UniProtKB/Swiss-Prot annotation:
Root EC class: translocase
Any one GO molecular function term: quinone binding
Protein's cellular compartments: Cell inner membrane
Disulphide-bridged cysteine pairs: none
A cellular-component GO term for this protein: NADH dehydrogenase complex
Lipid bilayer topology: Multi-pass membrane protein
Primary location class: membrane
Identification of the protein by name: NADH-quinone oxidoreductase subunit A
Pfam families for the chain: Oxidored_q4 (PF00507)
Keywords: Cell inner membrane, Cell membrane, Membrane, NAD, Quinone, Translocase, Transmembrane, Transmembrane helix, Transport
Length: 116
């Protein structure tokens, strides 16, 4: 196969992106002041340090939320096409659901759902 056309298109696209970025940096107005580098919080002036550590519990809840959010992202399309999939589709989604329930049981047993 001849990939010359593909290489030319990719190089042209990269060159275009590079020119646009360079042009925007060259002609964009700049204003350096202290307020530009402060964290913006709902229009209210910040109190204390802007960068602070969060407890690990927040990250654990976020990961659990993402896990079950992805579950619903898989369940909705499955529900739409479940009539066309037949028994094999039912078995596969049940297997997927059982794995997620086992993951939830494991997180519950380890105390991940309790705020400490």
């Amino acid at each position: 196969m001849n990939f010359t056309f593909l290489v030319v298109v990719l190089l042209t696209a990269l060159a275009f992106v590079g020119v646009v970025i360079a042009l925007s940096r060259a002609i964009s107005p700049r204003s350096y002041n202290v307020q530009k580098f402060e964290a913006y919080e709902c229009g209210i002036p910040t109190r204390g340090k802007s960068w602070m550590q969060f407890r690990v519990g927040y990250y654990l809840f976020a990961i659990l939320f993402l896990m079950f959010d992805v579950e619903t992202a898989f369940l909705f399309p499955w529900a739409v096409v479940m009539h066309d999939m037949g028994p094999q589709g039912l078995v596969s989604i049940l297997f997927f659901f059982i794995i997620l329930v086992l993951g939830l049981a494991y997180a519950w047993r380890k105390g991940a759902l309790e705020w400490k």
